[in-house]
């Protein structure tokens, strides 16, 4: 394979991995530990 193809596949894989981790953190099991600033600011 050509170098440019390998670099493109590597960067695409990193982007997909980062997006998956961000979605897991936002909506998965760890999201219960996140604080909600709107709930803390009760009017």
Swiss-Prot record:
Keyword Transmembrane recorded: yes
Principal location class: plastid
Transmembrane parts of this sequence: 7-27
GO CC field: chloroplast thylakoid membrane
Membrane-related topology note: Single-pass membrane protein
InterPro entries: PSII_PsbN (IPR003398)
Keywords: Chloroplast, Membrane, Plastid, Thylakoid, Transmembrane, Transmembrane helix
GO biological process, one term: photosynthesis
Location(s) in or outside the cell: Plastid, Chloroplast thylakoid membrane
Function: May play a role in photosystem I and II biogenesis.
Family of this protein: Belongs to the PsbN family.
Full protein name: Protein PsbN
The encoding gene: psbN
């Amino acid at each position: 394979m050509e170098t440019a193809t390998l670099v493109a596949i590597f960067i695409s894989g990193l982007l997909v991995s980062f997006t998956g981790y961000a979605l897991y953190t936002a909506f998965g099991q760890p999201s219960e530990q996140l604080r909600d600033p709107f709930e803390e600011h009760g009017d």
